[in-house]
């Protein structure tokens, strides 16, 4: 019998626009410059759903969290999340990436942080995330 475990994390958040100079009070940010990169793969083997490879332009710089959102950061928004720490052996420490959150939870966290700091926070698009990881 195979055991499937769904683990999702808030991989990062971004602040828009990048022209905002003040740092987040809660999330250390890094600026990602505008640029272009090849997104996806050639679609060979297990990566068939990421084909075709194509050029993507990121037209404006943006700021992204330096690390994934941590348990400690997320639990300022949702203290009950502490009950999930260490579940199935995942992410038990303050500085580890928060897991067991849904897309809706992640959006709600961004909305909460927007209200708290008065700056616009949102999740990165797939293209922004891949660019920051590969080329940015």
PLM features: what roles do these ranges have?
Residues 20-24:
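Boundary at the C-terminal end of the N-terminal hydrophobic targeting segment
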Residues 27-29:
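Basic phosphate/pyrophosphate-binding loop/patch that engages nucleotide-derived ligands
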Residues 1-5:
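Positively charged n-region of N-terminal signal peptides that target proteins for export
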Residues 36-45, 56-136:
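Active-site microenvironments of metalloenzymes and redox enzymes
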Residues 46-51:
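C-terminal, low-complexity/hydrophilic appendages and adjacent surface loops
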Residues 8-17:
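Bacterial N-terminal signal peptides
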């Amino acid at each position: 019998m195979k055991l499937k475990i769904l683990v999702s994390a808030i991989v990062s958040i971004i602040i828009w626009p990048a022209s905002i100079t003040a740092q987040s009070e809660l999330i250390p940010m890094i600026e990602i410059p505008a640029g272009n990169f090849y997104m996806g793969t050639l679609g060979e083997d297990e990566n068939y759903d990421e084909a075709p490879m194509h050029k993507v332009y990121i037209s404006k710089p943006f700021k992204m969290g330096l690390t994934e959102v941590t348990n400690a950061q997320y639990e300022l928004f949702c203290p009950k999340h502490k009950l999930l720490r260490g579940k199935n052996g995942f992410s038990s420490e303050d500085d580890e990436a928060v897991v067991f959150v849904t897309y809706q939870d992640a959006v709600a966290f961004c909305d909460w942080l927007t209200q708290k700091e008065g700056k616009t926070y949102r999740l990165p698009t797939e293209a922004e995330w891949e660019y920051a990881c590969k080329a940015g």
